[in-house]
């Protein structure tokens, strides 16, 4: 029984270790595909947040729910960003350009989401609207990135 338990435990550890790993992208095309998926996934989070801010400003969503949406979207966005950053790009200049371009957009998005969360908790609706407007530009840039490389 002890041996069976050890084998099962070792198998579970192996499965969990593999599930946290993201392998290298063997070609620039593969890397570009992963970058496009990342751009689309992160864009989705930004669109959710922007819609939530808009609905809250119009009185159609409670402030407490906005704060929840912002917090969860920020966590999801961070996970998307970390997953992309863990991918080993191929050794090409084009892959380096893709990474640099998308990383800038992801950083802008993460910063904007954090700022929105802070402003929402302070219930600063004027600044919240201004920050959401800035985040709209980041969302548009992510969409453009996905369209150009998709």
Give the label of every model feature segment:
Residues 16-20:
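C-terminal motif of bacterial Sec signal peptides marking the signal peptidase cleavage site
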Residues 21-26:
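Bacterial signal peptide processing site
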Residues 34-41, 45-110, 127, 134-148:
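Alpha-helical segments in soluble extracytoplasmic regions
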Residues 116-127:
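Short helix-adjacent coil turns
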Residues 1-11:
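Bacterial N-terminal signal peptides that target proteins for export
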């Amino acid at each position: 029984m002890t041996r069976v338990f050890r084998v099962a435990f070792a198998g579970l550890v192996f499965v969990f270790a593999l599930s946290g790993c993201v392998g290298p992208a063997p070609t620039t095309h593969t890397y570009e595909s992963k970058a496009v998926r990342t751009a689309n996934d992160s864009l989705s989070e930004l669109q959710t947040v922007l819609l939530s801010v808009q609905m809250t400003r119009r009185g159609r969503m409670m402030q407490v729910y906005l704060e929840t949406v912002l917090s969860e979207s920020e966590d999801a966005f961070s996970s998307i960003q970390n997953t992309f950053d863990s991918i080993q790009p191929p050794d090409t200049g084009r892959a380096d350009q893709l990474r640099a371009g998308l990383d800038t957009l992801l950083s802008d998005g993460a910063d904007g989401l954090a700022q929105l969360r802070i402003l929402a908790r302070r219930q600063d609706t004027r600044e919240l609207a201004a920050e959401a407007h800035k985040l709209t530009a980041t969302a548009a840039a992510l969409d453009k990135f996905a369209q150009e490389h998709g």
